């Protein structure tokens, strides 16, 4: 049976699984869907066309599914879709998408979103991502799986942060961070491969060595970006265990619209 505190407001039309728990003074809007075993903390607001999957935990005073902070927004029925097993802590704000993009903000599975984080409209957050307290994502930001964003960091709109990368605390990021790379500073600069993170996630020594070689080609050998990309493509077909990782590294760089940190 759904456990809804008597002071909570669940508007008609909301689809709430019978195992959901909703705390005191929380508000759930009419276009919200909440999956099994999800917990909504006290004073939280879940609104808009928002879908929450299973086993999510929403902290006190979180604002999930609010209108985009975009002056072009004209109350179109855009969406927020959140997957399973996410922890979203106190005072976090996550906004729906805009029609100027694809109309949906997405958050995958198993993410750890700490207090006071902001995830702007049209952001795409992958799986197993950690967003530390007060990290701020502007609109249209993309974050790959297993990325870690340090506290008090600001990420410019349309920036892409690659899988398994790490952004240090209090950083200002205005260009893309390739996968597997550590970045930090204001403005953020590259500081090597995220070796410890890759070891923890089961990357082989050979794969890590190949990524270190890729990093040196891109950042340490004095090559232009185009020159580095030629050599990176050769490294990606070297026949070793790191080929797939280096290929992902090169493909991310090729797809960059804002340019990568250098």
Swiss-Prot record:
It is found in: Cytoplasm. The keyword Acetylation does not apply. Its EC number is 2.3.1.129. Keywords: Acyltransferase, Cytoplasm, Lipid A biosynthesis, Lipid biosynthesis, Lipid metabolism, Repeat, Transferase. GO terms for cellular component: cytoplasm; membrane. GO terms for biological process: lipid A biosynthetic process. Signal peptide: none annotated. It catalyses: a (3R)-hydroxyacyl-[ACP] + UDP-N-acetyl-alpha-D-glucosamine = a UDP-3-O-[(3R)-3-hydroxyacyl]-N-acetyl-alpha-D-glucosamine + holo-[ACP]. It is an enzyme of class 2 (transferase). InterPro entries: Acetyltransf_C, Acetyltransf_C_sf, Hexapep, Lipid_A_LpxA, Trimer_LpxA-like_sf. It holds the Pfam family Acetyltransf_11. CDD domains: LbH_UDP-GlcNAc_AT (cd03351). PROSITE patterns: HEXAPEP_TRANSFERASES (PS00101). Pathway: Glycolipid biosynthesis; lipid IV(A) biosynthesis; lipid IV(A) from (3R)-3-hydroxytetradecanoyl-[acyl-carrier-protein] and UDP-N-acetyl-alpha-D-glucosamine: step 1/6. One of its GO terms (molecular function) is acyl-[acyl-carrier-protein]-UDP-N-acetylglucosamine O-acyltransferase activity. PANTHER family: ACYL-[ACYL-CARRIER-PROTEIN]--UDP-N-ACETYLGLUCOSAMINE O-ACYLTRANSFERASE (PTHR43480), ACYL-[ACYL-CARRIER-PROTEIN]--UDP-N-ACETYLGLUCOSAMINE O-ACYLTRANSFERASE, MITOCHONDRIAL-RELATED (PTHR43480:SF1). Belongs to the transferase hexapeptide repeat family. LpxA subfamily. Involved in the biosynthesis of lipid A, a phosphorylated glycolipid that anchors the lipopolysaccharide to the outer membrane of the cell. Homotrimer. This is Acyl-[acyl-carrier-protein]--UDP-N-acetylglucosamine O-acyltransferase. It comes from Burkholderia ambifaria (strain ATCC BAA-244 / DSM 16087 / CCUG 44356 / LMG 19182 / AMMD) (Burkholderia cepacia (strain AMMD)).
């Amino acid at each position: 049976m759904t456990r809804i505190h008597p002071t909570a407001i669940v508007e008609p039309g909301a689809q709430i699984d019978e195992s959901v728990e909703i705390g005191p003074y929380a508000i759930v809007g009419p276009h919200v869907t909440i999956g099994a075993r999800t917990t909504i903390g006290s004073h939280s607001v879940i609104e808009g066309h928002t879908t929450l999957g299973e086993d999510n935990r929403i902290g006190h005073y979180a604002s999930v599914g609010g209108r985009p902070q975009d002056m072009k927004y004209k109350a179109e029925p855009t969406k927020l879709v959140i997957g399973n097993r996410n922890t979203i802590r106190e005072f976090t704000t996550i906004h729906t998408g805009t029609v100027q993009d694809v109309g949906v903000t997405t958050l995958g599975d198993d993410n750890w979103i700490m207090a006071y984080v902001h995830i702007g409209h049209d952001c795409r957050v992958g799986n197993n991502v950690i967003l530390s307290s007060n990290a701020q994502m502007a609109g249209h930001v993309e974050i790959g799986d297993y990325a870690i964003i340090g506290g008090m960091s600001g990420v410019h709109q349309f920036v892409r942060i690659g899988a398994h990368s790490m952004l240090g605390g209090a950083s200002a990021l205005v260009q893309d961070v390739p996968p597997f790379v550590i970045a930090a500073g204001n403005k953020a600069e590259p500081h090597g491969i995220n070796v410890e993170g890759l070891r923890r996630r089961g990357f082989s020594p050979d794969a890590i060595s190949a990524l270190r070689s890729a990093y040196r080609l891109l950042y340490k050998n004095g090559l232009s970006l185009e020159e580095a990309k030629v050599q990176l493509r050769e490294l990606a077909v070297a026949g070793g265990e790191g080929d797939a990782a280096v290929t992902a590294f090169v493909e991310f760089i090729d797809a960059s619209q804002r340019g990568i940190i250098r």
